[in-house]
Amino acid sequence: MSATELRLAVVGAGGRMGRQLIQAINQQQGVVLGAAFERTNSSLIGADAGELAGIGHIGITVTDNLLAQVGQFDILIDFTRPEGTLSHLAFCVEHHKGMIIGTTGFDEEGKKAINCAAQTIPIVFAANFSVGVNLVLKLLEKAAKVMGSYSDIEIVEAHHRHKVDAPSGTALAMGESIAETLGRDLKDCAVYQRVGHTGERDPRSIGFATIRAGDIVGEHTAIFADIGERVEISHKASSRMTFANGAVKSAIWLSEKKSGLYNMKDVLSLEEL
């Protein structure tokens, strides 16, 4: 390990996303895996992180003890669950470690905690680290400006059977991007289910539909429908590696920041488009 290499830690190292992150770190120049963590009592504790990720032995042992490894990493990458992420967030604030947060499903209190922590440490917090998805979010702003005021807007998302939150964080980010452009509050205009006799559609609403099936990595489509035509803007992920690569590149970008809350628009300079 070179003294100039950025040292990254992965939480949930044995999960689907954790293994992809370890692979992405292994493939990216200028970064190295410094530590790998799993939840207490996990059967994977003690395993070699590289062997878990399918890249061979790398000499990094999976542990549940962040404190024991605090000197081994500069930035922590967390794609786990809200309660775990908030615990890791408190640790990173105490020890002044940057964070990449890809966890979704936070309530308002959780989001406030992240905002508060960003006053002390640098954080990239995004619902989706794919370059393509974040380009789609920018395109949705453009579409909403042109068609949003007179179109029926629906967002359809699909994920694998194991995803525990719905709608996905990316679908909500799409809705928020559209609503903000139109001067609406998503909490007031979102419709998450339609059952029974619903009556006519509220023209100001943004509808969400969720599919959970098989091994779908992630698919999102925003529909702007008018009489006689509709525009659909879609993104389909075929591998989690696109999210992992985005997270690792975000960590490299974040390493130059002292504190603050950032998203992928900042990392990719999308506001300049």
Curated annotation (Swiss-Prot):
The active site is at residues 159, 163. CDD domains: DHDPR_N (cd02274). Pathway: Amino-acid biosynthesis; L-lysine biosynthesis via DAP pathway; (S)-tetrahydrodipicolinate from L-aspartate: step 4/4. PROSITE patterns: DAPB. Keywords: Amino-acid biosynthesis, Cytoplasm, Diaminopimelate biosynthesis, Lysine biosynthesis, NAD, NADP, Oxidoreductase. It catalyses: (S)-2,3,4,5-tetrahydrodipicolinate + NAD(+) + H2O = (2S,4S)-4-hydroxy-2,3,4,5-tetrahydrodipicolinate + NADH + H(+); (S)-2,3,4,5-tetrahydrodipicolinate + NADP(+) + H2O = (2S,4S)-4-hydroxy-2,3,4,5-tetrahydrodipicolinate + NADPH + H(+). Pfam families: DapB_C, DapB_N. InterPro entries: DapB_C, DapB_N, DapB_N_CS, DHDPR_bac, NAD(P)-bd_dom_sf. It is found in: Cytoplasm. One of its GO terms (cellular component) is cytosol. Its EC number is 1.17.1.8. (S)-2,3,4,5-tetrahydrodipicolinate binds at residues 160, 169-170. The keyword Chaperone does not apply. NADP(+) binds at residue 39. It comes from the Bacteria. It is an enzyme of class 1 (oxidoreductase). GO terms for molecular function: 4-hydroxy-tetrahydrodipicolinate reductase; NAD binding; NADP binding; oxidoreductase activity, acting on CH or CH2 groups, NAD or NADP as acceptor. NAD(+) binds at residues 12-17, 38, 102-104, 126-129. Catalyzes the conversion of 4-hydroxy-tetrahydrodipicolinate (HTPA) to tetrahydrodipicolinate. Belongs to the DapB family. PANTHER family: 4-HYDROXY-TETRAHYDRODIPICOLINATE REDUCTASE 1, CHLOROPLASTIC-RELATED, DIHYDRODIPICOLINATE REDUCTASE. Homotetramer. This is 4-hydroxy-tetrahydrodipicolinate reductase. It comes from Proteus mirabilis (strain HI4320).
